[in-house]
């Protein structure tokens, strides 16, 4: 097995036994990037020199007895998290020259853990999209089929892990932006509970929905990555001070007797392809064979999720993105008057999808429409939260598909925003309710395209969904398959 193909767990064993060095591992990953990046276009920035320096530092720490799980491990970061001294563009022209003067809390924690950050990955502009086609700079391709999307908005991170261009990666999930690309690229994608991981230094899209989470080759690796970044942070007012369990130990516990709920509304929705349904049905049988009890649950307000999300998220985006006006930082189009400068800067700096969502959000918040749109959406969001609360009184986790279809063709839905929005129909509700969710590879379509299984857990119950996912992977081999590049 080539070094770039290793899981984090495997690489850690080899690093601790001195079989390999972090410099060997990092060079192998950088060589892999050089070989396949021209095909995949997963990265916006590759930090070769900084990565090799970090690897050298990690090797010194390992020689002195350091045993931190991520010491010397090459990781990629979605270009929406602030990295001191390294471009952070959010895949937008308006931030095309922005170099943050500080690190996001998650980045600080990863550096303290000895991780080697190899680069920043492509994404939909400001994390608005489901295909990574909304980037101002490049279009990322799915490593399993280069004519298809990797999903979005964290498509660059998912594609980088799938193509072995890093051992793990981080993204952000506002409506499915980690889980959906995880499903489309056959990697594990975890959205933690809202407040579990600090959002300090995460460039905001929708502040009540955004959450940082990991991509990995295995559930065990995802647990290691979550362990490194989870925890309370006073710099983030939405961070919650809840004890962080030992995820890597918790996932080893038996799943026998655990209860998993099937929301009938998810399986009755239109658009679910037979391949996806069959793969998820088979995954459910696999868990049942391990002693998991599967039962029906109801999430009756699921049918309103898309409508609610596409009022609340654009409304928050309209407010958050008002700061990009050409005055303090980022791109500026010089004009004679201040108003003309604002208009020119924002018109040329933001792409069409971002402009669309700002307009929708501004409309939903405007006088005369606030109660009818934003107010009503907020009320229905509360009902969605109540649905989850009732469901989790009966079960430990909720099981469903991640997406109704496998990855679609590049360009197939770019002129049809509604079809694009509906690709997140099974993932949006977890963000609206603030619960955790994970995508685990569970099969392939007749065309050889990856399919993911979604497990959702109650607030701060990540160890339960990770345990189920880990035991599912012990019984299957979907996660061991890699695309031919």
Curated annotation (Swiss-Prot):
Disulfide partners: none
EC class of the enzyme, as a word: ligase
GO cellular component: glutamyl-tRNA(Gln) amidotransferase complex
Record-linked SUPFAM superfamilies: Amidase signature (AS) enzymes
GO molecular function, one term: glutaminyl-tRNA synthase (glutamine-hydrolyzing) activity
A family per Pfam: Amidase
Catalytic residues of the enzyme: 78, 153, 177
Keyword list, A-Z: ATP-binding, Ligase, Nucleotide-binding, Protein biosynthesis
InterPro entries: Amidase (IPR000120), Amidase_CS (IPR020556), Amidase_dom (IPR023631), AS_sf (IPR036928), GatA (IPR004412)
Catalytic reactions of this protein: L-glutamyl-tRNA(Gln) + L-glutamine + ATP + H2O = L-glutaminyl-tRNA(Gln) + L-glutamate + ADP + phosphate + H(+)
One of the GO BP terms on file: translation
Record EC number: 6.3.5.7
PANTHER family linked: GLUTAMYL-TRNA(GLN) AMIDOTRANSFERASE SUBUNIT A (PTHR11895:SF151), TRANSAMIDASE (PTHR11895)
Family: Belongs to the amidase family. GatA subfamily.
Subunit structure: Heterotrimer of A, B and C subunits.
Function recorded in the entry: Allows the formation of correctly charged Gln-tRNA(Gln) through the transamidation of misacylated Glu-tRNA(Gln) in organisms which lack glutaminyl-tRNA synthetase. The reaction takes place in the presence of glutamine and ATP through an activated gamma-phospho-Glu-tRNA(Gln).
Matching HAMAP family: GatA
Record-given protein name: Glutamyl-tRNA(Gln) amidotransferase subunit A
Organism: Desulfatibacillum aliphaticivorans
């Amino acid at each position: 097995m080539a070094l770039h193909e290793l899981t984090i767990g495997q690489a850690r064993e080899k690093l601790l036994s001195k079989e390999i060095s972090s410099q060997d591992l990092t060079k192998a990953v950088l060589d892999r990037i050089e070989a396949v990046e021209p095909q995949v276009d997963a990265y916006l920035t590759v930090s070769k020199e900084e990565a090799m320096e970090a690897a050298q530092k990690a090797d010194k720490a390992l020689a002195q007895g350091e045993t931190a799980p991520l010491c010397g491990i090459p990781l990629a970061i979605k270009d929406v998290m602030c990295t001191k001294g390294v471009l952070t563009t959010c895949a937008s022209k308006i931030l095309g020259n922005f170099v943050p003067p500080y690190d996001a809390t998650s980045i600080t924690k990863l550096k303290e853990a000895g991780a080697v950050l190899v680069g920043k990955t492509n994404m939909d502009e400001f994390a608005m999209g489901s295909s990574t086609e909304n980037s101002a700079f490049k279009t990322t391709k799915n490593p399993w089929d280069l004519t298809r999307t990797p999903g979005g908005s964290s498509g660059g991170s998912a594609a980088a892990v799938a193509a072995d261009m890093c051992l793990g990666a981080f993204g952000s999930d506002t409506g499915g932006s980690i889980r959906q690309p995880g499903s489309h690229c056959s990697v594990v994608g975890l959205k933690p509970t809202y407040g579990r991981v600090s959002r300090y230094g995460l460039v905001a899209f929708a502040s009540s929905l955004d959450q940082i989470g990991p991509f990995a080759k295995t559930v065990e690796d995802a647990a290691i990555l979550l362990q490194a970044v989870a925890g309370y942070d006073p710099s983030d007012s939405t961070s919650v001070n809840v004890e962080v369990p030992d995820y890597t130990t918790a996932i080893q516990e038996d799943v026998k007797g655990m209860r998993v709920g099937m929301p009938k509304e998810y399986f009755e929705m239109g658009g679910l392809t037979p391949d996806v349904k069959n793969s998820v049905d088979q995954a459910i049988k696999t868990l049942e064979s391990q002693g998991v009890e599967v039962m029906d649950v109801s999430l009756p307000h699921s049918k309103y999720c898309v409508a609610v999300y596409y009022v609340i998220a654009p409304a928050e985006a309209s407010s958050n993105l008002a700061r990009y006006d050409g005055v303090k930082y980022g791109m500026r189009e010089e004009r004679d008057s201040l108003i003309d400068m604002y208009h020119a800067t924002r018109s040329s700096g933001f792409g069409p999808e971002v402009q669309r969502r700002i307009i929708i959000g501004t409309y939903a918040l405007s006088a005369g429409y606030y109660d009818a749109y934003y107010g009503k959406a907020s009320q229905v969001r509360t009902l969605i939260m109540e649905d989850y609360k009732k469901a989790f009184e009966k079960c430990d986790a909720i099981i469903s598909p991640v997406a109704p279809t496998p990855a679609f063709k590049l360009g197939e839905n770019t002129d049809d925003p509604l079809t694009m929005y509906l690709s997140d129909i099974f993932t949006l509700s977890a963000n609206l309710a603030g619960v955790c969710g994970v995508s685990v590879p569970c099969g392939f379509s007749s065309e050889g395209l990856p399919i993911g299984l979604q497990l959702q857990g109650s607030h701060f119950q990540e160890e339960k969904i990770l345990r189920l996912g880990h035991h599912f992977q012990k019984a299957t081999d979907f996660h061991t398959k890699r695309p031919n590049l």
